[in-house]
Structure formats: C-alpha cells, structure tokens
Amino acid sequence: MSDARTRKIEARLKEIVGDEVASLSDPRLKGLVTVTGVRVSPNLSHATVFYSLLAGGDPEEAREGLQSAAGRIQAAVGAQTRLKRTPRLRFEPDPTVERVTRIQRTLREVSGEDGDGNGTQE
C-alpha cells in the first residue's frame, strides 16, 4: 500500500476515533482525552491510537476506559470507512507528550527559570 494512502487512512481514522472518544461519558476519562495520532499496520488489520490526557486524568484509567469502548469505536470506524477489514484498535498514551514535557523541564533547569514562567534567575 502506498504511503499516501496509508497517511490518508490514518488521518481519517484519527478523525473518526477522535469524534467517538469525545462523545464517551466513561468516568475513567475524567481528564480531557485527545487523539493525537493513529498508526495502521501494513495490512490494515491493526491500528494503534495514540492519545494525550489533559486536566490531570490517570493515564492507566484512561487506557482502560478507551479499551472498554474499543468495540463501539471500531464499529463507528467500520460504518464510516470503506475498508475491506476494520482495523482492531489498540490505545496507547502518546510518548511525544511526555518527551516534550521532559525537554521543557530540562530547558527550564538549564536556563535557570524559577518555575513561574517569567524566566527570572534564582
């Protein structure tokens, strides 16, 4: 399958899954859950959905909540796409968000910021 087609499918899945996640009312998803990306396997049988969690939610609880809704979300993907086979969904926290946080923390430490964001030296 071409890279362009794969990217197009991933973008469409991100849109569908994001809409479905936004409509969930699971208490385990207390923080704002944002779908940040989707990666499909070469044969489209599996899709890893990456998400970030804002507003202090528990990442493991969020994963459990998303996994419990995977069937409903997968059904929506099947109904809204013309794929021969609907990919099996797996939810993973987006590692990029944690990396960015670590980098920002390191930069603040190196630059001597006092943590209030105004860049003053201690």
From Swiss-Prot:
Location in or out of the cell: Cytoplasm
Alphabetically ordered keywords of this record: Cytoplasm, Ribosome biogenesis
Composition skew (Basic and acidic residues), residue ranges: 95-111
Function comment: One of several proteins that assist in the late maturation steps of the functional core of the 30S ribosomal subunit. Associates with free 30S ribosomal subunits (but not with 30S subunits that are part of 70S ribosomes or polysomes). Required for efficient processing of 16S rRNA. May interact with the 5'-terminal helix region of 16S rRNA.
HAMAP family for the chain: RbfA
Similarity comment: Belongs to the RbfA family.
Description of how the protein assembles with itself and partners: Monomer. Binds 30S ribosomal subunits, but not 50S ribosomal subunits or 70S ribosomes.
Name listed for the protein in its UniProt record: Ribosome-binding factor A
Organism of origin: Rubrobacter xylanophilus (strain DSM 9941 / JCM 11954 / NBRC 16129 / PRD-1)
High-level lineage: Bacteria, Bacillati, Actinomycetota, Rubrobacteria, Rubrobacterales
Gene of this entry: rbfA
